[in-house]
Amino acid sequence: VRFGAPGQEKPGVVDAQGAIRDLSAHVKDITGETLAPASIDKLKRIDPASLPLAPAGVRIGAPVGDVRNFIAVGLNYADHAKEAGMQIPKEPILFNKLANTIVGPNDNVMVPKGSTKLDWELEIAFVVNRRARYVSEADAPGYIAGYAICNDVSERNFQIERSGGQWM
């Protein structure tokens, strides 16, 4: 977990009682590298009760900081393709989102000026902890540091009617 003001989040851990504990004396931030197996092994040795408590009611930030790439897969399940009136693609439709659009669970989402068809989808996010290229399906789990819930927000008028597909 990351907590604090936007742009100033600190790394934390949620203890067994649900309290947020401050990990900043041990790691600078929660990043893909922090979530690598060797780093996780070190963090597991820390007794959460020994860590300072975060202030009560503190803002929860995005789960991971220093995101370099946010890659998404369009029409990633048959029901969504059907709902959108589109064919299931033969190959994955990949697109990116800018890292500065990632916000915490209770943060406001910036709505584009002129938006008329704002849409959202609940997605699962995979946090990758190292460089990956041409990874086999069998090896893919070794690159996944963790999972998060993602609320994918899109402006469908801009995406489909104005540009004809994925856009940036």
What feature does the model see in each segment?
Residues V1-P92, Q166:
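N-terminal non-catalytic cap/leader segment that marks the start of a structured domain
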